[in-house]
A protein has these predicted regions:
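ATP-dependent small-molecule kinase phosphotransfer cores
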Residues: 35-94, 109, 121-123
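NTP-dependent small-molecule kinase module
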Residues: 2, 25, 129, 143-175
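A glycine- and Lys/Arg-enriched "phosphate-lid" helix/loop adjacent to the NTP-binding pocket
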Residues: 97-144
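Walker A/P-loop
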Residues: 16
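Hydrophobic anchor at the beta1->P-loop junction of P-loop NTPases
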Residues: 7
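P-loop (Walker A) phosphate-binding loop of NTP-binding proteins
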Residues: 10
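ATP-binding Walker
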Residues: 13
Length: 175
């Protein structure tokens, strides 16, 4: 049976970068769910939110997640930050045969620094004007989302780890 590794975490937590490095290291296919959606839809996530709204996005996000899960190959899937929090996506993730879900836990301060210069390219935070507003938004959002993120099989605090160290730690945890 083919193995699936789900990377879960808040936007800016490094899921895509870590997923690429991990998949290369263990010779698995890598899929970034947001990139998979934009490739198949032919427009960016921002454009989907603007033109078709969030409800449409969450519907197709679930459909594309199912499509990736059903690919018959060993794979690492980097999820969108909100993916586990909508519909019964977290149940789907946890009930996927031969899978591991990994929450890449980052501090609020790390996320603020990482996201502040990318605000305009992130639909959920594009309206924020200052680091203080961003910090408050992330704090509230994480409080809401942690009930989903913390259901992951593996929780890895990545705050003080370099990329290479995160990948090595994940390989150890995955056996």
């Amino acid at each position: 049976m083919k193995k699936t590794i789900f990377l879960i975490g808040y936007m800016g937590s490094g899921k895509s970068v870590i997923g690429k490095k991990l998949s290369n290291s263990i010779l698995y296919s890598f899929y970034d769910l947001d990139n998979f959606i934009t490739t198949n839809e032919g427009i960016t996530i921002n454009e989907i939110f603007e033109q078709k709204k969030e409800l449409y996005f969450r519907k197709i996000e679930r459909e594309y997640l199912n499509e990736l899960i059903n690919k018959d190959e060993h794979k690492v899937i980097s999820l969108g930050g909100g993916t586990p929090c909508y519909s019964d996506n977290m149940d789907l993730i946890l009930n996927t045969s031969n899978s591991d879900s990994i929450y890449l836990n980052r501090s609020i301060d790390f996320l603020v620094e990482r996201l502040y210069n990318k605000i305009s390219s992130r639909p959920l935070i594009a309206h924020l004007k200052s680091k203080e507003e961003l910090k408050e938004f992330i704090s509230k959002h994480l409080f809401e989302r942690n009930q989903y993120y913390l259901r992951s099989k593996i929780i890895l605090n990545t705050n003080n780890l370099e990329l290479h160290d995160v990948v090595e730690e994940l390989k150890k945890l995955l056996g």
